[in-house]
Amino acid sequence: MKQASPRAGGAKARRGQVARKTKETDVSVELRLEPGESSIATGLPFFDHMLDQIARHGGLTLSVQAKGDLQVDAHHTVEDVGIGLGEALRQATADKAGLARYGVAVVPLDEALVEAVVDLSGRPHLTFNAKLPSGKRFIGAYDVDLTQDFLQAFVNHARICLHVNVRYGRNLHHVVEAIFKATARALRAATAREGTALPSTKGLL
């Protein structure tokens, strides 16, 4: 007998959809809190790969289409995708009744090990403890310093609390990928359903 997913929310799937257009970027994001086929195109292949990690390991169906002023810098594109993804997640988790609320994940990638902890608190906060390997800053056209900027934009607009701790790692690619995977796994746990009650003694999140 097929068992229902712990994230199933009845007939209506939990989803969010955002379109954001500025003089610097044109971003659209659609997110569903259920596994499915994802479509991601930002003009930054490594960043696309990282967003795919969020979808796959977060148990999401994710569509991200972004066009930005990459001839200037990747910052606007990466940050605005973070804004869109955060807003879409906030929509998808607007009804927090029955959600686990908290999620913890520790993810290895060969020699790298990263911990992520999520609280769907309604209060945006990011702690990013990541001493990245020295000697290299770019993976393809992706500036690894933008990882924190992406997560900050995501957290601010999702209105969640996220702690990321890079315990260790030598290979820059492995460390950054483990950051995205750990964040995704923690989100997956936090958005799982555990019943019907709101996970707060205040009665509000």
Swiss-Prot record:
It holds the Pfam family IGPD. PROSITE patterns: IGP_DEHYDRATASE_2. InterPro entries: IGPD_sf (IPR038494), ImidazoleglycerolP_deHydtase (IPR000807), ImidazoleglycerP_deHydtase_CS (IPR020565), Ribosomal_Su5_D2-typ_SF (IPR020568). The keyword Cytoplasm applies. Its main location: cytoplasm. It catalyses: D-erythro-1-(imidazol-4-yl)glycerol 3-phosphate = 3-(imidazol-4-yl)-2-oxopropyl phosphate + H2O. It comes from the Bacteria. The keyword Amino-acid biosynthesis applies. One of its GO terms (molecular function) is imidazoleglycerol-phosphate dehydratase activity. Keywords: Amino-acid biosynthesis, Cytoplasm, Histidine biosynthesis, Lyase. Pathway: Amino-acid biosynthesis; L-histidine biosynthesis; L-histidine from 5-phospho-alpha-D-ribose 1-diphosphate: step 6/9. It is found in: Cytoplasm. Its EC number is 4.2.1.19. GO terms for biological process: L-histidine biosynthetic process. Residues 1-27 are annotated as: Disordered. One of its GO terms (cellular component) is cytoplasm. NCBIfam families: PRK00951.2-1, PRK00951.2-4. Belongs to the imidazoleglycerol-phosphate dehydratase family. This is Imidazoleglycerol-phosphate dehydratase. It comes from Anaeromyxobacter sp. (strain Fw109-5). The lineage of its organism: Bacteria, Pseudomonadati, Myxococcota, Myxococcia, Myxococcales. The gene is hisB.
